[in-house]
């Protein structure tokens, strides 16, 4: 079996709807191939959730047909955050969980990602086995062995109660005014209820999904509307989730953005204060130097993993630590959950706000963020602009100019045809100029 993936990226199979591989026929076959592999593992039962994209209906039906042909029973939750599917997969002792989502991407993209019976991303060998089955012709099991489908009517209530259970029982959100932005995505009927039931006054936005407006000028990837609303409403803070509920960005009462690095820092510092910190914190190559320095001042160990929440998870398991994060808002808290969970992460920050009697603004000031500029350059074809001499020369020039007071990172996105250019340093003007210089070199060689 080849160890090179053709379909699975860092977050499952993803692409533009209607273009291979996000087509009904391929997704049907993917369901069958996954069913063949998973049927050998155990219970022949899977939990399937989705976000609010209009294409979710089509892909859900295709998956159902493929899984049934392989003899698996599918239980559908309807719109449900990705971490909720991971949780329900565990509690129902299912063999796997499947989420139909393209996370923070626009509505015209979609994808399929899988969770193991432990609620974690599928191991590499299982993904490769599924890809091997995709090369075969579909063969249905005997008619008496065909799978059935059912609906889980209480999935939302189950997950809401789980989220609330991760918040300290002696604390309450009473007296807090929160603005909650659900990105017109999968958390729209979950997150506002979690915070309200814990006592907060909640102003909800991004809670009117129509199949096309997911992540559209709302949510964790665009917090401008949330920043404006928090200030207008004189709220204590705001929370923004992405389309599938595995990313969180927060906003303080002044309208300042608080990213995944700062969120992880606040959670780690609070755990240290309570004497409950287990090990250190895992970040990524994109993690701000300010977080690393801030943790160092507290005596908290820090290591970097490759970009992608699956690599953060791998490093956490390797080190035996419990807190990991990406600055984009993936926050993994292994003492609470098995995967990145935005609502649960937000609750831990709120516990710190209430428990310390400090504002989010005050808590976030504990670390100083270095100016960091990210430029995305779209490319097509098989060429690799990162190997171009002109790009390498531009990087070398910038690194020489930044010296020890900054860094440069270029990488291919694992989910989109993008080259990501990141420059970080003490001098914001120089950082911006440097990022544009490298991005232009990349564009010229695409």
UniProtKB/Swiss-Prot annotation:
Underlying gene: glmM
Keyword Isomerase carried by entry: yes
One family name in Pfam for this protein: PGM_PMM_II
Cofactor comment: Binds 1 Mg(2+) ion per subunit.
UniProt: Mg(2+) binding residues: 103, 242, 244, 246
Residue numbers carrying Phosphoserine: 103
Keywords linked to the UniProt accession: Isomerase, Magnesium, Metal-binding, Phosphoprotein
Cofactor(s) annotated in UniProt: Mg(2+)
Its job: Catalyzes the conversion of glucosamine-6-phosphate to glucosamine-1-phosphate.
Keyword check for Isomerase: yes
GO terms under biological process: carbohydrate metabolic process; peptidoglycan biosynthetic process; UDP-N-acetylglucosamine biosynthetic process
The protein's name: Phosphoglucosamine mutase
InterPro entries: A-D-PHexomutase_a/b/a-I, A-D-PHexomutase_a/b/a-I/II/III, A-D-PHexomutase_a/b/a-II, A-D-PHexomutase_a/b/a-III, A-D-PHexomutase_C, A-D-PHexomutase_C_sf, A-D-PHexomutase_CS, Alpha-D-phosphohexomutase_SF
């Amino acid at each position: 079996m080849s160890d090179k993936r053709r379909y699975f990226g860092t977050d499952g199979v993803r692409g533009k709807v209607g273009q291979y591989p996000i087509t009904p026929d391929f997704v049907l076959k993917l369901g069958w191939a996954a069913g063949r592999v998973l049927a050998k593992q155990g219970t022949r039962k899977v939990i399937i959730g989705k976000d609010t994209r209009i294409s979710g209906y089509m892909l859900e039906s295709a998956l159902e047909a493929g899984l049934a042909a392989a003899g698996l029973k599918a239980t559908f939750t309807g719109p449900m955050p990705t971490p909720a599917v991971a949780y329900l997969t565990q509690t129902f002792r299912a063999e796997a969980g499947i989420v139909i989502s393209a996370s923070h991407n626009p509505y015209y993209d979609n994808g399929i990602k899988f969770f193991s019976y432990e609620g974690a991303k599928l191991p590499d060998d299982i993904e490769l086995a599924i890809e091997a089955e995709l090369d075969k012709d579909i063969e249905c099991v005997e008619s008496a062995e065909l799978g059935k489908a059912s609906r889980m009517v209480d999935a939302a209530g189950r997950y809401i109660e789980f989220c609330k259970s991760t918040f300290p029982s002696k604390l309450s959100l009473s007296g807090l005014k929160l603005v909650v932005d659900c990105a017109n995505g999968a958390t729209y009927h979950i997150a506002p209820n979690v915070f309200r039931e814990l006592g907060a006054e909640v102003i909800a936005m991004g809670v009117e999904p129509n199949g096309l407006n997911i992540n559209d000028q709302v949510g964790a990837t665009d917090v401008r509307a949330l920043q404006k609303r928090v200030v207008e409403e004189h709220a204590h803070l705001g929370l923004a989730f992405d389309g599938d509920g595995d990313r969180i960005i927060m906003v303080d009462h002044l309208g300042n953005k608080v990213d995944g690095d700062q969120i992880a820092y606040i959670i780690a510092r609070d755990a240290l204060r309570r004497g409950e910190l287990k090990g250190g914190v895992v970040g990524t190559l994109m993690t701000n130097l300010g977080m690393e320095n801030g943790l160092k001042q507290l005596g908290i160990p820090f290591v970097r993993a490759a970009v992608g929440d699956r690599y953060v998870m791998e490093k956490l398991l390797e080190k035996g630590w419990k807190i990991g994060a990406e600055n984009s808002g993936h926050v993994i808290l292994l003492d609470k959950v098995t995967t990145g969970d935005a609502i649960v992460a937000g609750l831990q920050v709120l516990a710190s706000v209430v428990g310390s009697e400090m504002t989010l603004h005050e808590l976030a000031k504990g670390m100083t963020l270095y100016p960091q500029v990210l430029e995305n350059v779209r490319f097509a074809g098989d060429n690799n602009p990162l190997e171009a001499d002109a790009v390498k020369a531009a990087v070398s020039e910038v690194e020489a100019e930044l010296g020890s007071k900054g860094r440069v990172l270029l990488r291919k996105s694992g989910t989109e045809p993008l080259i990501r250019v990141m420059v970080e340093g003490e001098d914001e003007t120089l950082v911006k100029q440097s990022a544009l210089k490298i991005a232009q070199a990349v564009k010229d060689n695409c």
